[in-house]
Each structure stands twice: as structure tokens, then as C-alpha cells.
UniProtKB/Swiss-Prot annotation:
Binding site for [2Fe-2S] cluster: C122, C195
Matches recorded under PROSITE patterns: ILVD_EDD_1, ILVD_EDD_2
Highest taxon of source: Bacteria
Source organism of this protein record: Salmonella heidelberg (strain SL476)
Protein name, per record: Dihydroxy-acid dehydratase
GO MF terms, alphabetically ordered: 2 iron, 2 sulfur cluster binding; dihydroxy-acid dehydratase activity; magnesium ion binding
Length: 616
């Protein structure tokens, strides 16, 4: 039977100094021998998804203490991708994931904590904490801050729903008046919480449910709603139970690697494809799987993408539905219920509540449950009041959306598309694959061929798009923006949004070894691997080269002969130490980012560190 990790610092005369310091934090004799549980918070006033988390750590801690544990809270950093977008700040976003994972490991191992409750929410914070949890493999429960309410405003005598992306598009559209742009900007992000669409933050919080590491409702219940408080209270109680099960009963089923098994990862990716989640989730699931020592690769994702239909469509792929609507339709478990009935899930998995998938669906799938409290929870809706306070309202929808023929969530028979919301493409300049969010691609451009317009930075591409140099039919190629080449693998939300604002959203393609915001839609293909800075063929594309994209057949091709590609590769190598670097880009890169780049792998590996360079 494993002994509590914390006993290392709380037992024995030689630990008198450590105990003295523990006492200075408020611990007493009666606390030594109890499990020490880290409450890993991520409160910050920089990020709307985290601005309301300050007191929620205390809420969890109080429940831990009441249940027989000792709670110790610490904070991680949190980058707001939307605020960091469109300038040099975006270079720091993806690297912050590694810093978060490392900081959690450092704090938990340095102080010998026995278990964790991770209070996350936004884009890199949930993945970073997930990576740390699977790396450490001690009992853990995730409880996130919850989604933002959708913005709403009246345009042309019609009430429309809004989000961050609408503000960006309207702000760059020369045809939109200053008054209308200002109106949209002021209405787009009305409350605390993670941005209201199926962007990266909400996608990842949904996936922690599918992995079994968070409670039902975690991915979709609004940040502002009073019902969300119960998730935090339950997490504090449940983590003590899980911790005692492992340390006192030698029950390894309480450990995250046994909950988030390969079968659970396959279920999470199946959910992701069915709900048209952010392409960033691919990057983060691949990274998390490596931390869990699970053999889960782009090949597995490709296989799933070929058989899983799209059963849910949410902003940015449509303005009709946002996360508040997904919740009304049954949330993550509403989608999983339909996938289960279609025979597309592994049923032999459990969650942090100790329930198998069939047991969870029986209790929480709104189409089958007899539990009125569950139905009431899924009727939790928006209040439409600007606020930065968690749990500040208790409004409810009059009814649930259980219409699986024409509602937000569909059954297999009435799927939005027989093809899922994400696809992996392969070709002669994406030998290791690339990702497209098919949920956001118009049917008219699922097959697309055009001449390349090549840019070696996001900034140059934006200038060209807004300057009218990109025209209908072009394939915009932005390279040297991968994990190593950026460095930091910037999101390309501004280029894709500006294509829309210039009327080219359905008339152009954009391809990059960088990545996209969860708010991106359109024919936007990212994560091209190998990246340009790692010798990828994307570095050899020239202006005017023809690129053919065929999403139904999962193909992307540079229409050049092998001989021509080989000749260009030879010319690139002849540049010596300048080979596989941008020719004319002026970018200041800090030593911190250079350190990140020196170990970064391409996107097909999750952009994690190259362990071979560290002797691992």
C-alpha cells in the first residue's frame, strides 16, 4: 500500500524543520497524517475566463478541510490568447502551456502533495494542468471556471448572438460603420468565463469530461450560473475520497492515468470530432497522451475522423448556437449519448465519480434520465447581465432542447454531416499531416485549387490581406510560424478574420505550420508537419505554385514534380546555417523563447519538448 507522499515532509524527527514551516502555514498536530491536497488555481485579472476564480480556490479548500484533508492553494500563470493575439505577445501563448505544466510539477513535487484539484479554464491553462496531472499521476479532479454568456445585440431590428470573433471581423470590415463596430465590440463579451463559442478553452473543458477527469456539466455550465458552485463543492469532497482510496486502499483506479486511458482518449477525440472542436485540441491531446505514456498519434485521430459524424455545430461554425445552447441540449453527455447509441464510443471507461460510461449516461443524458435535478441543472441559462462575478444568477430555460432532429445536438440519423468536424490531411508538403476544422468549412470549398501567396510571418500576411494583395482563388501560405520557427506557433485568427472582413472567407484558403484560434472558421489548414524550421517541404513553396486541397479524400498537394522539390531542397540546404530560416523577417526573439524553440517538436508530436535532446 503506498504511503502518503506528504509523509516525507511531515513525519520523523529529521523533518522537524519542515513541520515547523508547515505549522507557520496554519497546520497543527492533528493535520500531520492527513492528505495534503494542492488546490491549483489560475486566477488573474488579465483574463475574463479567470477573473472570477480568486475565491473559488478557497471554496474548494474549505470542502477539502471539512472532508478530512489539508488544502494548500497556489496559482499558475494564465495567458489570454485574445489579448495576446495579433502582435508579439502571441509568441508566448503555446510556450506558456509548458511553463504551466512544469510549474505544477515543481510545486507539487517540491512540497510532496498527495493529490490536486485543478481550477482551470482558458486555452493553455487546462492543457498545461492536464499534462502535469498525467505526468505526476496522483489523484486529480478538474473543475473549470465555465463558459462566458454569449453576447447579444440588435442589428437591423434583429437580436443576434455575438462573440469575440464578431468584434474582430466587424472592426476590420471597411463597410461597417464606426457606430456598428463599437456596438458589437461592447456587446461581444458580456460576462466572466471562457469565450462563448466552441473555441479552444471550451473545447478542452469539454474534453476533460470525456476523459473522465471532471464532473458532468463541467464543459458547458455557464460561469455566471449559481449551479456551477456545486461542481466546486463536490470537487473538494470527492478529491479527498479519491485520495484515500488510492493511498489507504491501494486502489489505482483513482489515478488519472487509469481514468484517462487510451480508450478515454479515443472517446475524447471522438467527442471533439463530433462537436467540431478547436484544432488546438489535437495539439493538446497529443501532448497529454505523451505525458500519460499512451500511444495516441495523428494516425489514431485520422482513423477516428473518417468514421465519426458531426453531431453538434456551435460558434464559430454557426452563430445560431453557443455554449449556453449546448448546455441546454444536454452538454457533453448529450453528445456522448448520441455517439454511444451510434456505437462509436468505448464503454469500458470510468470517471472521477467512479461511474462507468453507461452509468454516467443513464444518470446524466437528458434524453434518458429520470433525475429531475439533472434536468433542472441542464436548464441553467444566461441572465444577459454584464458581470465579472461567478454564480451571480440563477436563470433557467423554460425547457430543454432534446430535439435530436433539428436542435443543437443531433442524433446520428440527423447529423449535420456524415463527416466529422475535424480532419487530418496528408500530402507532399504535409508528410506527417495537418489539421482542418471541417465544421467551419463551407461545402463549396471542400475541394480547392489555387496559386500560392507565400508569407514568412503572420504580420506580412495580414498586411497583404488588408492591402488587397490577396484575391479570390488564392492559397495564402504562412510559414516559419511553427513551434520552432515562430517560435511559439502563433494562432492565425487575425488573418482568417481579415479574409472574412475583406469578403474572401469562402474564396481563399489559408495554410500554415502555425495554428489557429478555436474561433477560426473557413478553409484554414494548420499544424503542417514537419514545420518549415524543421526542414519541412512547406519551406520550399514559392509564389504562384499550385496547391490542391481535397478534404473529402484527406489530401493536400503541392503540384510540383519530385525532381523540382528535390532541387529546391538542395538550394535551401546550400544556404548553410541560414537554411530553414526566414529570408527577410525582422523579429526580436527573447532568450526565453529561444530556449523553448531549441527543444520544440512539430505539431504532429503535440509541440512538446524533444526528449531525445534531454537524454529521455
Amino acid at each position: 500500500m503506498p504511503k502518503y507522499r506528504s509523509a516525507t515532509t511531515t513525519h520523523g524527527r529529521n523533518m522537524a524543520g519542515a513541520r515547523a514551516l508547515w505549522r507557520a502555514t496554519g497546520m497543527t498536530d492533528s493535520d500531520f497524517g492527513k492528505p495534503i491536497i494542492a488546490v491549483v488555481n489560475s486566477f488573474t485579472q488579465f483574463v475574463p475566463g479567470h477573473v472570477h476564480l480568486r475565491d473559488l480556490g478557497k471554496l474548494v479548500a474549505e470542502q477539502i478541510e471539512a472532508s478530512g484533508g489539508v488544502a494548500k492553494e497556489f496559482n499558475t500563470i494564465a495567458v489570454d490568447d485574445g489579448i495576446a493575439m495579433g502582435h508579439g505577445g502571441m509568441l508566448y501563448s503555446l510556450p506558456s502551456r509548458e511553463l504551466i505544466a512544469d510549474s505544477v510539477e515543481y510545486m507539487v513535487n517540491a512540497h510532496c502533495a498527495d493529490a490536486m484539484v485543478c481550477i482551470s479554464n482558458c486555452d493553455k491553462i487546462t492543457p498545461g494542468m492536464l499534462m502535469a496531472s498525467l505526468r505526476l499521476n496522483i489523484p486529480v479532479i478538474f473543475v473549470s471556471g465555465g463558459p462566458m454568456e454569449a453576447g447579444k445585440t440588435k442589428l437591423s431590428d434583429k437580436i443576434i448572438k455575438l462573440d469575440l470573433v464578431d468584434a474582430m471581423i466587424q472592426g476590420a470590415d471597411p463597410k461597417v460603420s464606426d457606430d456598428q463596430s463599437n456596438q458589437v465590440e461592447r456587446s461581444a463579451c458580456p460576462t466572466c468565463g471562457s469565450c462563448s463559442g466552441m473555441f479552444t478553452a471550451n473545447s478542452m473543458n469539454c474534453l476533460t469530461e470525456a476523459l473522465g477527469l471532471s464532473q458532468p456539466g463541467n464543459g458547458s455550465l455557464l460561469a455566471t450560473h449559481a449551479d456551477r458552485k456545486q461542481l466546486f463543492l463536490n470537487a473538494g469532497k470527492r478529491i479527498v475520497e479519491l485520495t484515500k482510496r488510492y493511498y489507504e486502499q491501494d486502489d489505482e483506479s483513482a489515478l488519472p492515468r487509469n481514468i484517462a486511458s487510451k480508450a478515454a482518449f479515443e472517446n475524447a477525440m471522438t467527442l471533439d470530432i463530433a462537436m467540431g472542436g478547436s484544432t488546438n485540441t489535437v495539439l493538446h491531446l497529443l501532448a497529454a497522451a505523451q505525458e500519460a505514456e499512451i500511444d495516441f498519434t495523428m494516425s489514431d485521430i485520422d482513423k477516428l475522423s473518417r468514421k465519426v459524424p458531426q453531431l453538434c455545430k456551435v460558434a464559430p461554425s454557426t452563430q445560431k448556437y453557443h455554449m449556453e445552447d449546448v448546455h441546454r441540449a444536454g452538454g457533453v453527455l448529450g453528445i456522448l449519448g448520441e455517439l454511444d447509441r451510434a456505437g462509436l464510443l468505448n464503454r469500458n471507461v470510468k470517471n472521477v465519480l467512479g461511474l462507468t460510461l453507461p452509468q454516467t449516461l443513464e444518470q446524466y443524458d437528458i434524453t434518458v434520465t429520470q433525475d429531475e435535478a439533472v434536468k433542472k441543472m441542464f436548464r441553467a441559462g444566461p441572465a444577459g447581465i454584464r458581470t465579472t462575478q461567478a454564480f451571480s444568477q440563477d436563470c433557467r430555460w423554460d425547457s430543454l432542447d432534446d430535439d435530436r432532429a433539428a436542435g443543437c445536438i443531433r442524433s446520428l440519423e440527423y447529423a449535420y454531416s456524415k463527416d466529422g468536424g475535424l480532419a487530418v490531411l496528408y500530402g507532399n508538403f504535409a508528410e506527417n499531416g495537418c489539421i482542418v476544422k471541417t465544421a467551419g468549412v463551407d461545402d463549396s470549398i471542400l475541394k480547392f485549387t489555387g496559386p500560392a501567396k507565400v508569407y514568412e510571418s503572420q504580420d506580412d500576411a495580414v498586411e497583404a490581406i488588408l492591402g488587397g494583395k490577396v484575391v479570390e482563388g488564392d492559397v495564402v501560405v504562412i510559414r516559419y510560424e511553427g513551434p520552432k520557427g515562430g517560435p511559439g506557433m502563433q494562432e492565425m485568427l487575425y488573418p482568417t478574420s481579415f479574409l472574412k472582413s475583406m469578403g474572401l472567407g469562402k474564396a481563399c484558403a489559408l495554410i500554415t505550420d502555425g495554428r489557429f484560434s478555436g474561433g477560426t472558421s473557413g478553409l484554414s489548414i494548420g499544424h503542417v508537419s514537419p514545420e518549415a524550421a524543421s526542414g519541412g517541404t512547406i519551406a520550399l513553396i514559392e509564389d504562384g505554385d499550385t496547391i490542391a486541397i481535397d478534404i473529402p479524400n484527406r489530401s493536400i498537394q503541392l503540384q510540383l514534380s519530385e525532381a523540382e522539390i528535390a532541387a529546391r531542397r538542395e538550394a535551401q540546404e546550400a544556404r548553410g546555417d541560414k537554411a530553414w530560416t526566414p529570408k527577410n523577417r525582422q523579429r526580436q526573439v527573447s532568450f526565453a523563447l529561444r530556449a523553448y524553440a531549441s527543444l520544440a517538436t512539430s505539431a504532429d508530436k503535440g509541440a512538446v519538448r524533444d526528449k531525445s535532446k534531454l537524454g529521455g
